[in-house]
C-alpha cells in the first residue's frame, strides 16, 4: 500500500482525540463561524486525512504558491487551493492569532482554527490560473458570486467530523479504508471516481482495469458538492449499491467521498489522484474530460478531452499512484460483449446510448435496453426522472383575467386527471412561497400560477401563457376562455404531460 501524500496520514480527529473535551469546552466561549456547504466538505477531508498533508486552511503564501505553481511552499504537489472564505464584516472582527470555533448548522462544533493569516485574494488570478478564466465556469461563478472576499488561514484542531445521518457504513475515512484493505489483503487497488450513475460499460471498464493491473476495485463516488444539475447523491448511491452486487465476489468495494468538486479539469484530476492515494488506492482511473464541467454557452469545451490524463501522467513520479487512462467502451450486439473502441474493427456493428439519449428515454418513458444497464438501475433512475406524463409542471397565467383562466384550467385538469395533483398557486405579496415551487414540480404537481414568476425561481417545466409572441402558450387578449383552455391542454399533450 502506498504512503499518504507527504508521507504521513494527517488524521486530526485521531491526533486530537485526547483533548476533544477540552477543545469543545473552549469552543463554546470563542467567536464562531458557521461553515458553508463547501467548507464542511473541505474541513471533513482535512480532519480525516483525505487532504493530507494539509492540517488547516491555506495561509497566504501557500495559497499563492498553489494558485501559481500547483505546489505548497514546501514544494509538495497540491493543485487546488483549500481556503476558508469569510465576508468582510466577519473578517473585521478577527485578529491574527485568534482562535475561532467552526460550526456545522450553527449548532455542532467541528473544529477550532488558530488564525495565522487574514488576506484578500486576487480572485481574477485564482480564476485564471486554477480554472482557466472562463466566467461561465461554475467554480468561477461560485468564486465571484458566493465565496467571501476575505480568506482566513490557520491550523485546525479537531473536535469531531461533520455530522452525517445517512449511509454511515459507506462513509469510510482514509484510515478506515486503509484498514479494510489491509484486513482483506488488498495490496493493489484501482480507484474509480464518479459523480454520475454507473452502467454496464462502467462495470466492464473497472473490471478490465482490475484484471490488467492485478488489482481490486474501489468505487469511490463523490457525495459532496458536484456540478449544478447533477443527479442527487441519494439516487446515485442506490445505483452504486445495486451495481456493486454485479461484480465478482470479493473484487469490489463501495465507499463514499465527501468532496466538494470544483470541476477544475486537469488540476482537479491531479487532486483526485492525491486524495485516492491518501485513501489507500495504488491506481487511479482518469477519465476523458475528467472533472470537466462540459461546455459553455457558446458550445466551447472548458477543457480538452485528454488534458486531465496528460497532466496527471506528467506528475506520475511525484504522485506515486499509477494512472489508468479511461478507455471508451462500447457494446457489440452480435457478440453480446463490451470492448474498448480501440480494439474494434471499424466494420463491426456497435451500439451505444449517450447521456442525452438516456435522459430523453427516461423523460419519455421509452425502453432502455438491458445491454446498456440493469433493469434495477433503470427503475431507480425512473423514480428520480419519471416520464413527462408523471412530471409536475407550472403554467404561469400572465393575462388580464388570470383568476378566471386559472379556475377554468384547474377544472379541466382535474377532469383530465393524469395521476397528478393540481393546484392554483398565488404568491402575490408572499414571496417566501416561491421557494415551494421546485418542490411542487418535483412531487409531480401541476401548478397554475396567477402572478408572474421572477427569473430566480429554479424549477423545471415552467411555461408562460401570455399574449407575447415569445410565450409558450400564445393567446390573444380577446380570446374566449374555452379556447385558451383548449390551447393549454393541446400544448401539454404535445409536450407529453398528458396522454389521451
UniProtKB/Swiss-Prot annotation:
It comes from the Eukaryota. Disulfide bonds: none annotated. Keywords: Amino-acid biosynthesis, ATP-binding, Cysteine biosynthesis, Cytoplasm, Methionine biosynthesis, Nucleotide-binding, Nucleotidyltransferase, Transferase. Its main location: cytoplasm. GO terms for biological process: cysteine biosynthetic process; hydrogen sulfide biosynthetic process; methionine biosynthetic process; sulfate assimilation, phosphoadenylyl sulfate reduction by phosphoadenylyl-sulfate reductase (thioredoxin). Residues 1-165 are annotated as: N-terminal. Its EC number is 2.7.7.4. GO terms for molecular function: ATP binding; sulfate adenylyltransferase (ATP) activity. One of its GO terms (cellular component) is cytoplasm. Residues 391-500 are annotated as: Required for oligomerization. The record marks 326 as: Induces change in substrate recognition on ATP binding. It is found in: Cytoplasm. The record marks 199, 202 as: Transition state stabilizer. The keyword Protease does not apply. Pathway: Sulfur metabolism; hydrogen sulfide biosynthesis; sulfite from sulfate: step 1/3. It catalyses: sulfate + ATP + H(+) = adenosine 5'-phosphosulfate + diphosphate. The active site is at residues 194-196. The oligomerization domain is distantly related to APS kinases, but it is not functional and does not bind APS. It is required for oligomerization of the enzyme, although the oligomerization state has no effect on the catalytic activity of the enzyme. Belongs to the sulfate adenylyltransferase family. Catalyzes the first intracellular reaction of sulfate assimilation, forming adenosine-5'-phosphosulfate (APS) from inorganic sulfate and ATP. Plays an important role in sulfate activation as a component of the biosynthesis pathway of sulfur-containing amino acids. Homohexamer. Dimer of trimers. This is Sulfate adenylyltransferase. It comes from Eremothecium gossypii (strain ATCC 10895 / CBS 109.51 / FGSC 9923 / NRRL Y-1056). The gene is MET3.
